[in-house]
Amino acid sequence: VTVVALMSQGLTDSSFKYHLESAKKNGVTRTEIAEILTHAAFYAGWPKAWAAFRMAKEVWTGGNADSVAAGSLEAYAQTIIFPVGKPNDAYAKYFIGQSYTAPVVTDGVPVVNVTFEPGCRNNWHVHKATKGGGQTLVCVGGRGYYQEWGKEPVELHSGDAINIPAGVKHWHGAAPDSWFSHLAIEVPGENNSTEWLEPVGDEEYAKLK
């Protein structure tokens, strides 16, 4: 309760870190604090939440996700506050390479942490809705890319956020030499669906740095 109250006021200073450390000592796990802060982000705002995420990552992991390149999944997982989860078998046919998913918030607005191994990316796709809809990505670890059809790729790092309106053809995934994780947040809408399209070809992807 104290952690959420301080975050909502933007008081992510040394006192906030003290309360995070106390929460950890009292048995709050990394997965639990990630879920708590994500829930609170919808009320306190993502800028305040991101400051809290960074401090929680220091307390629970002590690592730096951006410093992990093409190492093991286990090593990378220790550098991010959100769980990696399980292999994304249900959507594997829409990805090149291995991805993983971990539900963070299941009630209200669903939030899923998606992790991509180095070189992994999803196919071009479009989020559809008759009203509203779309998706928001909040990057939480590693290095990746987002690209809209007809535009240049955008390099992504921890703390970056991308708003994807319904009807926009796009893809996202890891850089060739780095793991990458983002929260995928479904924007509420009517008759939401996703249309999966062609893969991002190796020649096209190889142009990325």
Segments predicted by a language model, with ranges:
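A short beta-strand-loop-beta hairpin characteristic of the jelly-roll/cupin
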Residues: 121, 131-158, 168
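Ligand-binding loop in jelly-roll beta-barrel domains
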Residues: 166-194
